[in-house]
Amino acid sequence: MAEVEYRCFVGGLAWATNDESLEQAFSQFGDITDSKIINDRETGRSRGFGFVTFKDEKSMRDAIEGMNGQELDGRNITVNEAQSRGSGGGGGRREGGGGGYGGGGGYGGRREGGGGGGYGGRREGGGGGYGGGGGGYGGRREGGDGGYGGGGGGSRW
């Protein structure tokens, strides 16, 4: 496998939180190599989650321990270890992501970019889930294969 990344998934973020304030909040735990808020490609607005990557495992573990459930910009955040990029889809076990928070459709639809698999994972096109690629609760989108009510964008519910 490629180099190990010590990456935290950070969920429940306020819309106002940006890459810099995310990094600032976590920098007390060790050297950060990357911090990124995931934005909606169409609106440019934060999707309410992001990733912080540390230089070493101890810093990552300390950050998870120290920040999970804490308040950042007025919201209680969730912090846990991110799925590794090579693991496929954390929630969906599908090629190219699937499931989880934002990956492969997940909660809130189609995405490109982001982390890997599970939480916000790498994907282009379809996917399903709530609001996902082929429709579901989020309406008609191009590509993809359904989820709840998916396929052609319709839901029979």
From Swiss-Prot:
> What upregulates or represses it?
In response to stress by wounding.
Q: Name one Pfam family in it.
A: RRM_1
Q: Which UniProt keywords apply?
A: RNA-binding
Q: Where is each RRM domain found?
A: 6-84
UniProt feature, compositional bias: Gly residues: 86-138, 145-157
Q: Which Gene Ontology terms cover its molecular function?
A: RNA binding
Which InterPro entries does this chain map to?
A: Nucleotide-bd_a/b_plait_sf, RBD_domain_sf, RRM2_NsCP33-like, RRM_dom, SLIRP/GR-RBP-like
Report the protein's function: May play a role in the biosynthesis and processing of heterogeneous nuclear RNA and in the maturation of specific mRNAs in response to wounding.
Q: What is this protein called?
A: Glycine-rich RNA-binding protein
